A protein has these predicted regions:
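Helix-turn-helix
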Residues: 18, 22, 26-60, 64
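Hydrophobic alpha-helical segments that form the core
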Residues: 109, 114, 158-179, 191-198
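Hydrophobic alpha-helical connector segments
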Residues: 64, 78-109, 162-169
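N-terminal intrinsically disordered/low-complexity leader segments
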Residues: 1-14, 207-211
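Amphipathic C-terminal alpha-helical segment
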Residues: 101-104, 149, 169-186, 199-209
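Amphipathic alpha-helical segments used for helix-helix packing
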Residues: 90, 105-127
Length: 211
């Protein structure tokens, strides 16, 4: 009996992952509000009622989609950068990994979080908005932390504001993502890297450490 139960749970987990992998791609293009049990069932090996049974409500589906997108984001941006030394080297590795994540269309619609943060930015008190905010705050705080480590190590000037550096880097990355999608111009990623490199060098970074 236990073996049968474990087998059903394993199949359910696999099905849930398959549905969510489709959901993050769809939401990156059309937004989280566009998700529906029926549409996701059409592209997964289950019917609409089975998808509904996995999540219970549309909000739960949206929350699970944000969580899955965060996992994929971590896999493609955070994990590759961990091989670099903490501080300036890792900060730069994060910038490079992010540009590759967007450029390679890990999500069909470019950066998943760019799509959904615009969709939910004015919906205060919404659980899905809270999840999107938490994901973005986690990313930004990680950038700030690496910037602070760089300052502490003397890799950036002592008067550098890590939060300002993180803000400017984020702005460059987001602009590259948006313009690449709108204009079909992948050259914007190199321009973003050039601009990010310049802002770090202006704050005392060693150009040789920045690729």
């Amino acid at each position: 009996m236990t073996t049968q139960t474990d087998g059903r749970r394993l199949r359910g987990d696999r099905t849930r992952r398959t549905v969510l992998d489709g959901a993050v791609q769809e939401a990156s293009v059309r937004g989280l509000d566009a998700l529906s049990f029926g549409a996701l069932a059409a592209s997964a090996p289950v019917n609409k009622s089975a998808v509904a049974g996995l999540f219970g409500s549309k909000e739960n589906l949206q929350l699970a989609t944000v969580e899955r997108a965060s996992e994929i984001y971590t896999e493609h941006v955070i994990v590759p950068a961990r091989s670099a030394e903490r501080g300036l080297a890792r900060l730069w590795a994060l910038v490079v990994a992010w540009t590759e994540y967007s450029r390679s269309r890990v999500f069909r619609g470019g950066c998943f979080f760019r799509t959904v943060e615009v969709e939910f930015d004015m919906r205060e008190g919404c659980a899905v908005r809270d999840a999107v905010v938490a994901a973005q705050e986690s990313w930004e705080s990680y950038l700030v932390h690496q910037g602070q480590l760089a300052v502490d190590a003397g890799e950036l000037a002592a008067d550098t504001d890590p939060a300002q550096v993180a803000f400017e880097i984020n702005a460059l990355l987001n602009a590259a993502n948006d313009r690449s999608l709108l204009l079909g111009d992948d050259g914007v990623y190199e321009r973003a890297l050039t601009a990010a490199r310049s802002l770090l060098v202006a704050r005392g970074a060693d150009r040789a450490m920045l690729g």
